[in-house]
Amino acid sequence: MWHWSLLCVFLLVPLANSTAPISFEANPDTKRLYDDLLSNYNRLIRPVVNNTETLTVWLGLKLSQLIEVNLKNQVMTTNLWVKQRWFDYKLRWDPEEYGGVEQLYVPSEHIWVPDIVLYNNWDGNYEVTLMTKATLKYTGEVFWEPPAIYKSSCEMNVEYFPYDEQICFMKFGSWTYNGAQVDLKHLDQIPGSNLVQVGIDLTEFYLSVEWDILEVPATKNEEYYPDTLEPFSDITFKLTMRRKTLFYTVNLIVPCVALTFLTVLVFYLPSDSGEKVTLCISILVSLTVFFLLLAEIIPPTSLAVPLLGKYLLFTMILVSLSVWTTVCVLNIHFRSPSTHNMSPLVRKLFLHFMPKLMMMRRTQYTLPDYDDSTPSNGYTNEIDVRDSISDFPSEFKDSQDGAYDNGMQNSVDSDNVIPRNLTPEVLQALRAVRFIAQHIKDADKDNEIVEDWKFVSMVLDRFFLWLFTLSCVFGTLAIICQSPSLYDTRSPIDRQLSEIPLRKNNFMLPPDIVRQVLT
């Protein structure tokens, strides 16, 4: 029995030792430094020796990503690192007293930090996104670079959309302290100058697929507000951006230009097809769809009409005019002698002058030859009677010789015209034949007039074809070429300064790391 008791003792003793808490001691010098610095530290008091002393805060921005530039809501969304630096005399120490510790990382909630906010904020979130740790140096210098996603209000200029350039401002300053208490300066500011040409750090910037950044200057300002005795200092960052136009050119401009030049084909379509007005209305409906699409993109402002809106309006006016002119051309095309008479001026202008100007050649329309010397009043001349009788049978011809000779003599005395001494059946047949011939002759003359009206409509179609073609070409160039960004040859600064390459689905390592891997 005692064997089992001894075995249990040997098993329980190691188990008890294994469950005992194990303590690890941190860096004692760092812990002691942290306790000494922050034990009696008040983070609510501005860190100056004298209350009248001005605390200088150096401010800078590092742009990580241009998330969105919303024209409709007029807001710019950016991902930034807000770099801040200042001196806190209460956070100084001697490294020799703390084991050579020269740098310490502390939560930013435990020390005094300047209340730097974005003045022109859009969504109400004025502060930084994440309260990261601050870096303390033994000299009392404090570094703090919290990340933030800001939505800043930006007045967009849509006059030259989609070939536009936008200028947005980001105004940072202390919300509580005036310029006599906290003086803001840019990290790269030169003494005696308030302007920094490259005011935003773009070394960690991910290139945007929609915008090119041209300029990023920063300016220090001092401004008086109502009921304040001292000015408040702020730093205003200016972002000048130029839109990359490939997407809008392919998806908006090219289809719109194609619809514009479809208007020209209306006048090339023959009038007899009956589809001219249908084509015009179809183009007009397509332009209306483009207008609805544009209304979803641009902001509802009455200050300026965007470039694309001007072009769509110009195209819609052309299509409306094409509908009007097409109706007029069709009206002329289907005119007839019974409803309209062609005036000599119209005949001379559209049948002789303008065809030469429009380089048109008309096929000559010739009427059949008719004998206009035959009266149409039921009488005939001597030659007609002789020809008629010569065609009759010989019996009838012989029986009529005497009467014919007497009638012939009388006809000479009465304007060479005699009554027809033919049978009623023959006379009726002759009248019917002459009526048919006269009807065909009148129909041919009417057809000639109808063809003249059709040719006038063809001349008008050719004239409007050239007129609308020139209008489309010069109108397109005149409207689109208004944009100043088409003539801006400045190289994007983000491509020059960014150290993050943009490649197609490839991540490129820095050259020094590549060399280390290869060696």
Swiss-Prot record:
GO terms for molecular function: acetylcholine-gated monoatomic cation-selective channel activity; transmembrane signaling receptor activity. Glycans are attached at N50. Gene3D superfamilies: Neurotransmitter-gated ion-channel ligand-binding domain (2.70.170.10), Neurotransmitter-gated ion-channel transmembrane domain (1.20.58.390). One of its GO terms (biological process) is synaptic transmission, cholinergic. CNS in embryos. Keywords: Cell membrane, Disulfide bond, Glycoprotein, Ion channel, Ion transport, Ligand-gated ion channel, Membrane, Postsynaptic cell membrane, Receptor, Signal, Synapse, Transmembrane, Transmembrane helix, Transport. Residues 1-18 form the signal peptide. It is a multi-pass membrane protein. This is Acetylcholine receptor subunit beta-like 2. It comes from Drosophila melanogaster. The lineage of its organism: Eukaryota, Metazoa, Ecdysozoa, Arthropoda, Hexapoda. The gene is nAChRbeta2.
